[in-house]
Amino acid sequence: MHGSCSFLMLLLPLLLLLVATTGPVGALTDEEKRLMVELHNLYRAQVSPTASDMLHMRWDEELAAFAKAYARQCVWGHNKERGRRGENLFAITDEGMDVPLAMEEWHHEREHYNLSAATCSPGQMCGHYTQVVWAKTERIGCGSHFCEKLQGVEETNIELLVCNYEPPGNVKGKRPYQEGTPCSQCPSGYHCKNSLCEPIGSPEDAQDLPYLVTEAPSFRATEASDSRKMGTPSSLATGIPAFLVTEVSGSLATKALPAVETQAPTSLATKDPPSMATEAPPCVTTEVPSILAAHSLPSLDEEPVTFPKSTHVPIPKSADKVTDKTKVPSRSPENSLDPKMSLTGARELLPHAQEEAEAEAELPPSSEVLASVFPAQDKPGELQATLDHTGHTSSKSLPNFPNTSATANATGGRALALQSSLPGAEGPDKPSVVSGLNSGPGHVWGPLLGLLLLPPLVLAGIF
């Protein structure tokens, strides 16, 4: 009996772990947060034409908490109480959030946007794209939540993603950024890094600062000239690839904590006159050469960037498309993937959207609105579609938003994208749905699996 109790005590943590790991997922992981910021900055650095005033974007926990709180409400529509915050929405009926897919959905709208005229093609959405590349926006915070029922959408079991931005973008009549040489118009107090304007003294700069390293017990002395010992062993560090060392010449070396440099692939080592070391256990170098680490970070403008792999095929598409996806690694947004079938939705503005657009047109010019609410009647400008779709394409009208069931059969995962806007500027919010083959409400099977496994495990412990 004692053995059975011990066995059950061992099984209990395993059962709790099983239920915890297979339950509904809804919060963004640290990796997904990092990926969201990285993809925003990659897209911002690679805009064409190049931007002269594009700010580096960073994560903001307050915005993330605000976005998460709204995501918990499970509403497919923009937050009316978001104040002076920009907002992008994305939803997917699949097992967890797909950050690269969400970013590509938003960024693909660039082919409908005319930068010179600051207009969007009639019937298209550009608000996601313009918010992503809005030069003055430099803070982002996102939150996701699993919704068994998303208000405004007939589909069930949906993962909703909300991203908020500060300062907000999508100002009526204004371009997202100024064309020109990258970083040529950075604000005062900013410097250029990877074609983006980054604040001087930001946390990202910490790894670029040199550190004084006088203790290196893990390295062997390979050369010593005119060095003196004063009670402690001394050595000449001839190669320290993991550290950055400032010049120490003819001065006493004091003990300092070694600083680890995460990116220092190359270094130039020079010899300096020997320096005296006072007593400092366990080991103090008496001659420390100056090592200048030359960072060789790849430029975002020199070659195409391959984005992190996704469990889906992130085929960039307009915000009112339906595209099948399979389990294939993600590729660069500049490459198209075939052979997919896309259904292009209706291009007409919905009646309620037209009424809102007319009402918004009466506001002062300084009001911030979504660019695509007022589509231009002239032809699309210089930004052309760079992606080739080789699948069979047919047209199909959406009966009315937010009913998305008419755009695809409920046979797999779907993604919904709602354009970015500011309060009072909601436009033709037509969702896009992405169908998949091996998706589904995986959150249902987790608890059931735990319940099915519980009786056999208990019986095994008793007998």
From Swiss-Prot:
One of its GO terms (biological process) is negative regulation of cell growth involved in cardiac muscle cell development. This is Peptidase inhibitor 16. GO terms for cellular component: extracellular space. Residues 1-27 form the signal peptide. May serve as a marker following prostatectomy for prostate cancer. Keywords: Glycoprotein, Protease inhibitor, Secreted, Signal. InterPro entries: Allrgn_V5/Tpx1_CS, CAP_dom, CAP_sf, CRISP-related. It comes from the Eukaryota. It comes from Homo sapiens. Residues 262-281, 303-341, 383-408 are annotated as: Disordered. N- and O-glycosylated. O-glycosylated with core 1 or possibly core 8 glycans. Glycans are attached at residues 114, 403, 409. Interacts with PSP94/MSMB.
